[in-house]
């Protein structure tokens, strides 16, 4: 299920655009996640009080966490599938401490695709979208495998 060199090129090219504004992209991704899937808010103690889009827009903590999420994902994507050393500690905290279900990783992947498509429509065509979806699926599958190693069925 690996990606071809060309697919990784698509992923990393669009990711460069994401990295040009990690705070903006990350904030929008988390807002989209929480608006589309409000049940995910239950996993974030410090964000539970954010009920409206305006509250989410005004949250510096949400913006900071968005940067953290996309920074970590960027490190993983740049490894082009050889991400064991980056993925293992992330999977461990998400499995044992935060208890984030794999389904929620699917939800955030959808949010990432939607936000990139909205912000970079002209650069995120069908080939780039397909490659990014495939890269995020690889990430989720590898997270799910690691979850099992840590005894979390997610």
Curated annotation (Swiss-Prot):
GO terms for biological process, alphabetical: removal of superoxide radicals
EC supergroup of this enzyme: oxidoreductase
Cellular localisation: Cytoplasm, Sarcoplasm
GO molecular function: heme binding; metal ion binding; nitrite reductase activity; oxygen binding; oxygen carrier activity; peroxidase activity
Catalysis performed (reactions): Fe(III)-heme b-[protein] + nitric oxide + H2O = Fe(II)-heme b-[protein] + nitrite + 2 H(+); H2O2 + AH2 = A + 2 H2O
Cellular component, GO annotation: extracellular exosome; sarcoplasm
Enzyme Commission code(s) on record: 1.7.-.-, 1.11.1.-
SUPFAM superfamilies per UniProt: Globin-like (SSF46458)
Subunit structure comment from the entry: Monomeric.
Protein name as it appears in the record: Myoglobin
Taxonomic lineage of the native organism: Eukaryota, Metazoa, Chordata, Craniata, Vertebrata
Gene transcribed to yield this protein: MB
């Amino acid at each position: 299920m690996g990606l071809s060199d060309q697919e990784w090129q698509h992923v990393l090219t669009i990711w460069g655009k994401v990295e040009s504004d990690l705070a903006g992209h990350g904030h929008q991704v988390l807002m989209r996640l929480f608006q589309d899937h409000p049940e995910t808010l239950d996993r974030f103690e410090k964000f539970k009080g954010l009920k409206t889009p305006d509250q989410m827009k005004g949250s510096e903590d949400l913006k900071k966490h968005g940067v953290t999420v996309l920074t970590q994902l960027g490190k993983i994507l740049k490894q082009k599938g050889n991400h064991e050393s980056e993925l293992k500690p992330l999977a461990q905290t998400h499995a044992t401490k935060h208890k984030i279900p794999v389904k929620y990783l699917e939800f955030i992947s959808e949010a990432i695709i939607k936000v990139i498509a909205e912000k970079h429509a002209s650069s995120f065509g069908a080939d780039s979208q397909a490659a990014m979806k495939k890269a995020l699926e690889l990430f989720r599958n590898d997270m799910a495998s690691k979850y099992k190693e840590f005894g979390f069925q997610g």
